[in-house]
Amino acid sequence: FELNATEVSAVYAVQQLKDRLKNPSSLKLLSVAISKPYENTSVPIKIDYTAENNIGGTVEDTYYCVVSLATYDKDNDTWSCGLESLFQSRYRLELVNSLLGSKSSIEGSQEYAKKEYNRGKPANLDAEKIISNQALTIKEVEN
């Protein structure tokens, strides 16, 4: 499959989701959508999926994130992408608060990403094309 920058951004988002799952190999995508219009630098993404939980049951859920629009380096034949900085900082704060057992009054990463996604018009991507390209190497960049 030939991928465009938006699709590579979605592949990266699915890779990030897999990193958060207890059983990443159980991930099944139900749908993948981006929100248009998005800024040239950020892509809000919504992923509906199922995965196995730690007791063997299947959970259906939605994951929202905001990633940078992937860029392609022709000289090195590599794609680059990363989590959008506001999304990433909110996610890190959630992790720290979780470790400390405290709550934050700041809007969480999922709420932030869902709000960004809902600001635009959803456009579905081919979920099969996204999941079949999970082996794609994407250089992670800080935004």
Where are the model-predicted features located?
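Cystatin/cathelin-like cysteine-protease inhibitor module
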Residues: F1-N143
